[in-house]
Amino acid sequence: MTSILVLNGPNLNLLGTREPAVYGHETLADVERLCREEGERLGHAVACRQSNHEGQLIDWIHEAGRACVRGELLGIVLNAGALTHTSLALHDAIKGASVPVIEYHISNVHAREPFRHHSWIAPAARAVMAGLGVAGYALALRALVLVAPPRQAA
């Protein structure tokens, strides 16, 4: 069984308390539980990780690329938080690792402040989804299953 990696970036550990009018009252633990349950329905194990550090996210993306080559990983659902709008390094990591990525955002970033309208992740991602709340993670997992190329173990 191939797995799926869900990566959450800076400040997503504060879900449930940070701007609940924007992000809702669900916690990161709720997100991770939802993702594991949806993964099980889809026939994939889901691993969830969160970091406030860009370099850690990059290291995980590199690891994911190697796991994809081995046929162990289908791809990544990535909510890079504010790094979406600033990180060329995450863009380059995704491109370099050749791992299918669905970029996801809990809020509709395009209806928010102008600085949130540009994504450095989007050009490297297979698809971009936003504004569906925490429940949208389940949809992002389904999207990844639909668009990721089939993998064979090397």
Swiss-Prot record:
Active site, UniProt feature: Y23, H105
Residues given in the record as substrate binding sites: N79, H85, D92, I106, S107, R116
Lineage: Bacteria, Pseudomonadati, Pseudomonadota, Betaproteobacteria, Burkholderiales
Keyword Cell inner membrane (UniProt): no
The reaction(s) this protein catalyses: 3-dehydroquinate = 3-dehydroshikimate + H2O
Presence of the UniProt keyword Membrane in the record: no
Record-linked PROSITE patterns: DEHYDROQUINASE_II
InterPro entries named among the record's database cross-references: DHquinase_II (IPR001874), DHquinase_II_CS (IPR018509), DHquinase_II_sf (IPR036441)
SUPFAM superfamilies in alphabetical order: Type II 3-dehydroquinate dehydratase (SSF52304)
Protein name: 3-dehydroquinate dehydratase 2
GO molecular function, one term: 3-dehydroquinate dehydratase activity
EC number annotated for this UniProt entry: 4.2.1.10
Top-rank taxon: Bacteria
Family: Belongs to the type-II 3-dehydroquinase family.
One BP term from GO: quinate catabolic process
CDD domains: DHQase_II (cd00466)
Pathway(s) served: Metabolic intermediate biosynthesis; chorismate biosynthesis; chorismate from D-erythrose 4-phosphate and phosphoenolpyruvate: step 3/7
Signal peptide annotation: none
Transition state stabilizer (site feature) positions: R18
HAMAP family: AroQ
Native organism: Ralstonia nicotianae (strain ATCC BAA-1114 / GMI1000)
Keywords: Amino-acid biosynthesis, Aromatic amino acid biosynthesis, Lyase, Plasmid
Role this protein plays: Catalyzes a trans-dehydration via an enolate intermediate.
